[in-house]
Amino acid sequence: MIFVTLEHILTHISFSIISIVITIHLMTLLIHKIAGLCDSSEKGIISTFFSITGLLITRWIYSGHFPLSNLYESLIFLSWSFSIIHMIPYLRNHKNDLSVITVPSVIFTQGFVTSCLSTEMRQSAILVPALKSQWLIMHVSMMLLSYATLLCGSLLSVALLVITFRKNMDIFCKRKNFLIKSFFFAETEYLNKKRSVFKNTSFLSFRNYYKYQLTQRLDYWTYRIISLGFIFLTMGILSGAVWANEAWGSYWNWDPKETWAFITWTIFAIYSHIRININFQGTNPALVASIGFLIIWICYFGINLLGIGLHSYGSFTLPSN
């Protein structure tokens, strides 16, 4: 009973802290001159990380197994993974460009766990025989870490596509306006317009340079986060194959979950191949990664909710027979 109460407290503490953190982020977007807000935000994420860590440890102690057996536990671990990803640039003293993605991801996951899941779905249950293996920690943790990192990388690629699209639209509109004005206005008026354009050239070039730097940083972090997630996904699939051979006598059964994991792996393998090619950097790999965002949610959430296949017991609370 004490552990259940402690788990309940830690769940709400982590959600409250991350809510405060995202409020601070919104304030920094509106008011840049308030000192200490950014540091408070980073400390809040660290506090959230320790709260979720305590929650997982508490769950592990009173359930008697590593907390990765149902939807509730996997979502808590996913939220924990997002908080780890957030702290990577912070620990390396880099500018944290990931906070725009990781902080909303943590609050969305924690909010869903706190508000949307029923009490029955949060209950710990006895593991089915197939899950009573040391491979549970290795396989499921690697898969969830890969989901978290690949989701962050995919969202960064979506942001890259949006910025690039807006930039191209601005260029198109300027060219269109230029053609219309040069066709309808007199030569003298055109020259006056041209002079005013030259006066604003420094401002426009600065703004374009800022967008260029932003897209470069997004591309940099997208590639590195997805590369890390791809490694986790590969390790998760390989460890799952070994575990499947021990449990079911076959390394691969083309179960719906396995099939979609393979599709996910293929999508991000294509991304890595395109991204390495210098002729296709930029929007082309970002487009592939953004498609991967939907594929991951189908693989993680969609297949489990359908309740089909050998992995269907990983979604909801298991019966304690």
From Swiss-Prot:
Protein name: Cytochrome c biogenesis protein CcsA
Membrane topology summary: Multi-pass membrane protein
InterPro entries given in the database record: Cyt_c_assembly, Cyt_c_biogenesis_CcsA, Cyt_c_biogenesis_CcsA/CcmC
Chloroplast in keyword set: yes
Molecular functions per Gene Ontology: heme binding
Protein keywords: Chloroplast, Cytochrome c-type biogenesis, Membrane, Plastid, Thylakoid, Transmembrane, Transmembrane helix
Keyword check for Oxidoreductase: no
Functional summary from the UniProt entry: Required during biogenesis of c-type cytochromes (cytochrome c6 and cytochrome f) at the step of heme attachment.
SS bonds (residue pairs): none
Family membership noted in the UniProt record: Belongs to the CcmF/CycK/Ccl1/NrfE/CcsA family.
Main location group: plastid
Cell location: Plastid, Chloroplast thylakoid membrane
Transmembrane segments: 9-29, 44-64, 71-91, 98-118, 143-163, 225-245, 260-280, 288-308
GO biological process, one term: cytochrome complex assembly
Assembly with partners or alone: May interact with Ccs1.
A Pfam family it matches: Cytochrom_C_asm
Gene Ontology CC annotation, any one: plasma membrane
Gene: ccsA
